[in-house]
Swiss-Prot record:
One of its GO terms (molecular function) is rRNA binding. InterPro entries: bL21-like, bL21-like_sf, Ribosomal_bL21, Ribosomal_bL21_CS. Keywords: Ribonucleoprotein, Ribosomal protein, RNA-binding, rRNA-binding. Coiled coil: none annotated. It comes from Macrococcus caseolyticus (strain JCSC5402) (Macrococcoides caseolyticum). This is Large ribosomal subunit protein bL21. GO terms for cellular component: cytoplasm; ribonucleoprotein complex; ribosome. Part of the 50S ribosomal subunit. Contacts protein L20. Belongs to the bacterial ribosomal protein bL21 family. This protein binds to 23S rRNA in the presence of protein L20.
Length: 102
């Protein structure tokens, strides 16, 4: 059984037992988090929501919080002595999908 959920402005296909990394969620490590924005549930029969499937939820356990790889943003304008260098690390949350309830 699989489901398509929406979180952090992105849509993800998830299955039970799968590990996923999503945009940072306000949840404690070791706690459970429930996704209500379930767009589709598949298995023997497929349920497609418009826009969400009524009564469907996906439950996940919060493994840890972390930060992604560092990216460098560099702005430069030639002949004007303008240079700006800035780094960024996106925060994320690692989840393990426990159950898909449809």
């Amino acid at each position: 059984m699989f489901a398509i959920i929406e979180t952090g402005g992105k849509q993800l296909k998830v299955e039970q037992g799968q590990e996923i990394w999503v945009e940072k969620l306000n949840a404690e490590e070791g706690s459970t988090f429930t996704f209500d924005q379930v767009l589709m549930v598949g298995g023997e029969t497929v349920k497609v929501g418009s826009p969400v499937v009524e009564g469907a939820t996906v439950t996940a356990k919060v493994e840890k919080h972390g930060r992604g790889k560092k990216i460098t943003v560099f702005k430069y304008k030639p002949k004007k002595n303008y240079k700006r260098k800035q780094g960024h690390r996106q925060p994320y949350t690692k989840l393990v999908i426990e159950a898909i309830n449809a």
